[in-house]
């Protein structure tokens, strides 16, 4: 199934989280937090400004992004977990 985000929304796949700490301690599943990093899989056409013009998004497909911990809506597509979020929920693009 394919999905095309609308307006200023993005489809983001969370990056896998670390299984161990820097000191080598293995983190159990019950103690793990959802990562706030992901890769942009699809982007909408952009936001419509007050003047009626479409403003392109700053992020593009393939960008690695840092997003708000509680931002976005969890969705499951073809057995994989994704987030649909607004561009405003993106805190930065990782380079």
Curated annotation (Swiss-Prot):
Gene: groES
Molecular function terms from GO: ATP binding; metal ion binding; protein folding chaperone; protein-folding chaperone binding; unfolded protein binding
Main location, first listed in the record: cytoplasm
Oligomeric form and interacting partners: Heptamer of 7 subunits arranged in a ring. Interacts with the chaperonin GroEL.
Protein name from the UniProt record: Co-chaperonin GroES
GO biological process terms on file: chaperone cofactor-dependent protein refolding
NCBIfam families: PRK00364.1-2, PRK00364.1-5, PRK00364.2-2, PRK00364.2-4, PRK00364.2-5
Keyword annotations of the record: Chaperone, Cytoplasm
PROSITE patterns associated with the record: CHAPERONINS_CPN10 (PS00681)
Cellular compartments per GO CC: cytoplasm
Protein family membership: Belongs to the GroES chaperonin family.
Functional note: Together with the chaperonin GroEL, plays an essential role in assisting protein folding. The GroEL-GroES system forms a nano-cage that allows encapsulation of the non-native substrate proteins and provides a physical environment optimized to promote and accelerate protein folding. GroES binds to the apical surface of the GroEL ring, thereby capping the opening of the GroEL channel.
PANTHER family according to UniProt: 10 KDA HEAT SHOCK PROTEIN, CO-CHAPERONIN GROES
